[in-house]
Amino acid sequence: MPKMKSHRGACKRFKATASGKVKRERMNGSHNLEHKNRKRTRRLHQSTLVDSTKEKQIKRMILA
């Protein structure tokens, strides 16, 4: 059986931290920002952690 390939799209969107959690960027923060308030745009530029229910799936995709 051949080796599993990592999912190239997932590798560009998610990063594994040193503690084993998975980081992601928030959506809706790249354009059309003129109608979003400053507090929201600041929050959208911060990265966050992936939910624990999806973490195992994403790790399998990026660390394969």
From Swiss-Prot:
Pfam families the UniProt entry points to: Ribosomal_L35p (PF01632)
SUPFAM superfamilies linked: L35p-like (SSF143034)
Keywords on record: Ribonucleoprotein, Ribosomal protein
Biased composition, class Basic and acidic residues, residue ranges: 25-35
Presence of keyword Ribonucleoprotein: yes
Highest taxon above the source species: Bacteria
GO biological process, one term: translation
MF term (GO), any: structural constituent of ribosome
Keyword flag Ribosomal protein: yes
PROSITE patterns noted in UniProt: RIBOSOMAL_L35
Span list, region Disordered: 19-41
GO cellular component: cytosolic large ribosomal subunit
NCBIfam families named among the record's database cross-references: rpmI_bact
Protein family membership: Belongs to the bacterial ribosomal protein bL35 family.
Protein name, UniProt field: Large ribosomal subunit protein bL35
Gene: rpmI
